[in-house]
Amino acid sequence: MVEFSRDLLGLEQRIVMVTGAGRGFGRSVARSYARNGATVITVDPDVEMATAIASEVEQLGATAIPIRGDMSVVLDVMNTFEKIEELFGMLDGIVHVTSAESKTPFVELLEGEWYDLLNADVKSSLYVLQQGLRYLSGGGFVTLVLPPLQREQPHVAAIRGAVAGLIEGATRIFPTNVRVNGVIPSRDPVGEEHDRSLVRVAVALGSMVSEGVRGQLLEVLLPEPPHQPEIYDLLRELP
């Protein structure tokens, strides 16, 4: 469980939108913001997953609103922000978790998969930053979680570089009271217990302890996941 001092973080009753909240890093980040008193907008392309994590957030004693939204589709992005404004009249922060995965070797990458990667991570980050500039005019934060470093193929590295460029550019044009930063995990998500270092950084960047921190890309070294028994170990245990 990821716990912080609420007084130190200053997240009580803050309105925080978490994309990709239904799974992986997004789910863990949403739960941690909830534990620290924030109202969490759980956004996911799968409405059932958005609703499920919203239910988990409410079980933690926080307020949650699920919204089905694909951040690579500009109309979905606009509708998501408009709905948040209708419900709350304001937004304090955004955590956008990029979601594309590719295990395809670079020499075998096809055009269709390349465009899917661009849509899922670069377009979505651009759209979220665009709306963030509009809806966070009173101050706040945008934290982007980039593709993990363990994905070493050149096309994934290019995606990371593009998102990093968006963070740098947004920092130059956003008001100084809006903090835009990025987090790069060392590996893919495996579960809240083993991903807590990433979650702590994502929550800290949205809190008062990071006031004035802008344009940073923070690499987070996560512990290796627990060893999974090989199939022959499992077979050995059968009667």
How would you label these PLM feature ranges?
Residues 182-239:
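C-terminal helical subdomain
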Residues 105-106, 113-118:
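Substrate-binding pocket helix/loop in short-chain dehydrogenase/reductase
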Residues 97-103:
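Conserved NAD(P)H cofactor-binding loop of Rossmann-fold oxidoreductase domains
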Residues 126, 141-172, 184-191:
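Catalytic loop of short-chain dehydrogenase/reductase
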Residues 38-52:
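Conserved glycine-rich Rossmann-like NAD(P)H-binding loop of the short-chain dehydrogenase/reductase
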Residues 22-23:
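Conserved glycine-rich cofactor-binding loop
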Residues 54, 58, 65-68, 73-89:
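Conserved amphipathic alpha-helix within the SDR
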